[in-house]
A protein has these predicted regions:
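A short acidic, amphipathic alpha-helical/loop segment
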Residues: 51-55
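Extracellular/luminal Protease-associated
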Residues: 35-47
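Short, glycine-/Ser/Thr-/acidic-enriched flexible segments
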Residues: 27, 45-46, 70
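Core beta-strand elements of the Rossmann-like FAD/NAD(P) dinucleotide-binding domain
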Residues: 31-33
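Short hydrophobic alpha-helical runs that function as membrane-insertion/retention elements
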Residues: 21, 39-41, 61-67, 71
Length: 233
């Protein structure tokens, strides 16, 4: 099982024999790169060796650095990590529009299903669980209406988990925790996308010219309930 390494106190990060070397005052901690899913650095004064950054890129391990407010602000991503890079990106550019609609519908269906399963796992309202199942089925029946079904389902879902007064994107502790978790998840997904030879800016449904992670933001939808679950506890 791979772990997310959270750095808050360490003075320096380096590498030794394919192991992350954490230097903290007089202590040395070593962790095999094979056991690392991602590294989050919250100490802005931590020194990170260039050779470590190269090895992390080679192993598709995102390095996420937070600002002074502890918000994930920067993450590393490998540039050329696939032997058929040009072929994959050309395929991605030419993805069929109808196929993308079908894929997006499948993503939303799975997202709502995962939300429903989490509500059920947390023993939330049976009525809300049933309503999300209805919206999931509606997505299957009407591909073009998936975004509307997602919006309704998400409103019910979030208020069921975090309370009737909860509103997404407001400036509060729960939203800050959700945003933090989503940013970490987004960085991990982006590294996996690049490892497969695709480009994270070329999305399935997201297509903003100002967003470098459109495809990451498509794929993350299915996995958001993982973060929601962690924040709930």
């Amino acid at each position: 099982m791979q772990n997310i390494i959270h750095i808050t106190q360490s003075n320096e990060l380096s590498i030794s024999n394919n192991q992350l070397l954490i230097l903290e005052d007089e202590r040395e901690i070593k962790i095999s790169l094979n056991d690392i899913l991602a590294i989050i650095v919250e100490n802005c004064h931590c020194r990170i060796s260039a050779i470590l950054q190269l090895r992390l890129a080679e192993n598709n391990i995102p390095l996420i650095i937070c600002n002074e407010k502890h918000q994930p602000t920067l993450h590393s991503i490998a540039l050329y990590n696939h032997f058929h890079l040009t072929v994959r990106i050309n395929e991605q550019i030419n993805w069929n529009i109808n196929k993308k609609k079908e894929l997006w519908s499948k993503i939303i269906e799975n997202k709502i299903n995962n939300q429903r399963n989490l509500l059920k796992h947390l023993s939330k309202s049976e009525l809300s669980v049933a309503r999300l199942e209805t919206y999931r089925k509606n997505v299957l029946e009407n591909v073009d209406g998936s975004d509307q079904q997602e919006a309704i389902a998400s409103r019910i879902y979030f208020q069921e988990i975090y309370g009737d007064k909860f509103k997404r994107f407001e400036d509060d502790g729960v939203n800050s925790a959700l945003n933090y978790g989503y940013m970490v998840l987004r960085a991990i997904i982006s590294s996996k996308i690049v490892a497969k030879g695709f480009h994270p800016s070329l999305g399935i449904n997201h297509h903003s010219q100002f967003n470098s992670y459109n495809l990451s933001d498509d794929i993350i939808e299915v996995f958001r309930p993982i973060v929601d679950y962690v924040v709930y506890y």
